[in-house]
């Protein structure tokens, strides 16, 4: 019940934050003299696919990056941090790629293969390497 109320209140706050009010009380003089209040305020774009004015760049004045690639880079940096922390933890617990694969119950996902490459590099050099997200060919 608390979760439902919390969701309803947060949704209401979010919707109220995204709206603009031109006037709370309208007088008949304003509405009869060709009021432009309906067209004076632009609607805010609520999704990244619809941009009312132009494409916006979060980090740069030039618009060389599109909005989708900026949003993807946030996910990539979070994935880099999470996977690097996971690999370091596994390495400190002295878990080999075979034991990691056994813990994953034999599933051969990308983490098992990448951990093997990362683990081999860490064993060969003696330093902890950084794992970097590599975009699959379907995205490029």
From Swiss-Prot:
Locations listed in the record: Secreted; Host cell
Motif RxLR-dEER per UniProt: ranges: 56-72
Keyword tags: Secreted, Signal, Virulence
A GO cellular component entry from the record: extracellular region
Induction annotation: Expression is induced during host plant infection.
Signal peptide: 1-24
Keyword Lyase assigned: no
Source species, domain of life: Eukaryota
Family: Belongs to the RxLR effector family.
Name this polypeptide is given: RxLR effector protein CRE2
Taxonomic placement: Eukaryota, Sar, Stramenopiles, Oomycota, Peronosporales
Gene: CRE2
């Amino acid at each position: 019940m608390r979760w439902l109320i919390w969701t309803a209140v947060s949704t209401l706050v979010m919707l109220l934050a995204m709206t603009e009010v031109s006037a709370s009380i309208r007088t008949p003089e304003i509405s009869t003299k060709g009021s432009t209040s309906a067209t004076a305020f632009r609607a805010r774009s609520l999704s990244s696919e619809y941009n009312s004015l132009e494409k916006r760049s979060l980090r740069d004045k030039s618009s060389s990056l599109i909005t989708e690639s900026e949003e993807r880079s946030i996910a990539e940096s979070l994935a880099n941090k999470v996977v690097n922390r996971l690999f370091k933890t596994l390495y400190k617990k002295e878990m080999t790629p075979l034991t990691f694969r056994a813990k994953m119950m034999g599933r051969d996902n990308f983490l098992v293969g990448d951990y093997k490459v990362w683990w081999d590099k860490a064993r060969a050099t003696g330093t902890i390497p950084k794992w970097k997200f590599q975009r699959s060919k379907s995205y490029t």
